[in-house]
Structures are given as C-alpha cells and as structure tokens.
C-alpha cells in the first residue's frame, strides 16, 4: 500500500475517513439500488471509495505480502490477453480468496459479495492511577455488523465474532510532515463478539481516549462515536 508506506498507518487515517464519509453520503442519496463491489458497473463511491477501504482492510488483517501475492497471481493469469478474455471482478475475488486464511475468508466475502455496515462505538471508559505509577483503564465497546440488501433494508445481523481494532490513546501529535496523528498507548486487533465487549488494560501513561476502529478501517454508519474521552 503506497500511501501507508509513505505516511504510515497514523497518517492514512484522513484518507480512510474521507473515503468512508464519501461512500456513506453517496449511497444515501443514490437513486439506484446499491450493488456489491463485485457486481457494480457504475458508481465511483463503490468501486473507488468503498473499494479502497476494503483493500486496505484486507492487507491490514492478513498482511500486505499475502495480498500482493494474490494480485500478482491475478495479473499473471490475465497478462497479454492469453486467456482470450478480459479479467472480471470475480477473477480478482478468486485470486484474493485463494491466498486468504480460512479464518479471514469472511473479510473477502463481506468486501466483494455483500453490502455490510458496522455500528461500532465506545460505551464508557474509566481509568485509575495505580500505586506503581501505571494506569488501569476499563472500557466497554459495542460492535454490530449488519448485512443489507440492495434497497438498503437490513437483512441480517451477524452474531459471529469479527476482527476489530481497539485502543487507548494519549493526546494527538503532529508528525514531521505536519500531519496530525494518533498517539496509541495500547492498540490491538481483537476478535469482538456482537454487542458489548469490556477490556481492562494497564498502560504506563494516562490515556485520554478509548477507541474502537479508531482509524476508520471498517465501513461504520457513524464513525464519530468510535472514540470517547476516558474519565478519571
């Protein structure tokens, strides 16, 4: 991922956030039924904004090298028109699916075949100073993944566990490129159950905010509640 290599995971947050907001806004006002990424014919907000978020999420959970292996296989198979036909989105899906570990194949299906929106938010967060100078923070996040049909109607709430980032953060910083970046004290990609998930984490410094999917890697209906101030 060229942008991640150039700006880092912190620096790419603005791009992901803008892609998310553009996709959500466009789908809200579109007069056409929404198609999945695999089936879409027109609609920049799907094949560009949504597509960029899906590809970023895939390399994030299974590694950039594995995604690149799938892309190379896809390109090698269809180079020079040797197969006598142009590649399709299904061919790209198959190439990525083939290199994806079984536990993560749902990510490829969700991204290419389904219309999925998350509802992630931080419910509460409280920290306490310990005698050894460290801080113990307990916070609860709520995660919900919903499948929609092409008319925008909810058809299924996923009750299985899903991979979602959670973290504790200090005050935002400015990097050498002048970009505002997050300052994580704790950050992990976790398997979250549908509904409330509570964590107790000890950090060296006092956290100011708790977050779920704080870098907006997932397509969340309202990403503004993904961060919450930590109370004393």
Residue ranges of each PLM-predicted region?
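Long, contiguous hydrophobic alpha-helical segments, chiefly transmembrane helices and signal peptides
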Residues: 54, 111, 164-166, 210, ...
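Short beta-strand elements
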Residues: 184-190, 221-232
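Short acidic/polar inter-strand loop motif in beta-rich domains
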Residues: 146, 173, 214-228
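Hydrophobic alpha-helical and helix-loop surface patches within well-folded domains
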Residues: 1-139
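Extracellular acidic, Ser/Thr/Pro-rich low-complexity tracts
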Residues: 98-100, 143, 220
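Beta-strand-rich binding/interaction modules
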Residues: 104-105, 117-192, 197-213
């Amino acid at each position: 991922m060229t942008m991640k290599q150039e700006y880092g995971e912190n620096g790419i947050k603005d791009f992901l956030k803008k892609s998310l907001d553009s996709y959500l806004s466009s789908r809200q006002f579109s007069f056409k039924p929404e198609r999945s990424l695999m089936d879409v014919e027109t609609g920049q907000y799907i094949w560009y904004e949504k597509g960029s978020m899906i590809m970023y999420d895939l390399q994030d959970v299974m590694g950039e090298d594995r995604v690149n292996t799938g892309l190379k296989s896809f390109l090698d198979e269809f180079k020079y028109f040797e197969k006598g036909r142009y590649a399709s989105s299904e061919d790209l899906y198959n190439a990525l699916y083939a290199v994806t570990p079984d536990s993560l194949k749902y990510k490829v299906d969700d991204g290419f075949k389904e219309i999925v929106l998350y509802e992630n938010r931080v419910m509460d967060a409280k920290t306490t100073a310990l005698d050894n100078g460290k801080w113990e923070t307990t916070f609860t996040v709520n995660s919900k993944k919903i499948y929609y049909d092409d008319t925008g109607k909810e058809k299924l709430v996923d009750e299985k566990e899903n991979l979602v980032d959670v973290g504790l953060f200090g005050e935002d910083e400015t990097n050498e490129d002048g970009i505002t970046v997050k300052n994580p004290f704790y950050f992990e990609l976790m398997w979250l159950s549908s509904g409330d998930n509570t964590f107790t984490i000890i950090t060296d410094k006092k956290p100011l905010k708790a977050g779920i999917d704080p870098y907006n890697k997932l397509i969340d209906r309202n990403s503004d509640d993904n961060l919450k101030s930590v109370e004393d």
